[in-house]
Design a protein with these regions (language model features):
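Non-heme di-metal
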Residues: 1-121
Length: 121
């Protein structure tokens, strides 16, 4: 797509930023707090650094899934949820558009990744 940033590129950029926060920002905050004798504060910053690393890992995984096209396909039957209207679609692939609200396939996520997991029939 000429002149447009691809979604996976944004996720790779987000991964980079999360790793930077983990390795530089919160790690250094923790080091300063530790040097100044604030051990509890230092511990909190070190824990936040670990969380930021996990965020980076997740952005990277999502970028790879988008890049390969695997995000919108699966080997076994999957249930997909439209984040706009809540429609649940069953199948190996996400439809091009939601049959209910007509939003693009990018609004679908696997039900297993939905913010509030509910039993689907």
């Amino acid at each position: 797509i000429s002149g447009r940033i691809r979604l996976e590129e944004l996720h790779y950029a987000a991964q980079h930023n999360e790793y930077e926060e983990a390795d530089d920002v919160y790690q250094s905050f923790g080091d300063v707090a530790k040097e100044e004798g604030f051990m509890e504060v230092a511990s909190a910053f070190y824990q936040i650094a670990k969380i930021e690393k996990i965020h980076g890992d997740r952005f990277g995984k999502l970028a790879e899934l988008l890049k390969t096209g695997a995000y919108f396909e699966c080997q076994e039957g999957e249930k997909w949820m439209c984040l706009n209207c809540g429609h649940i679609h069953s199948g190996l692939k996400v439809p091009g558009v939601c049959p209910v609200c007509r939003h693009e396939r990018g609004y679908f996520i696997p039900v297993s990744l939905a913010p509030y997991l509910m039993e689907c029939e």
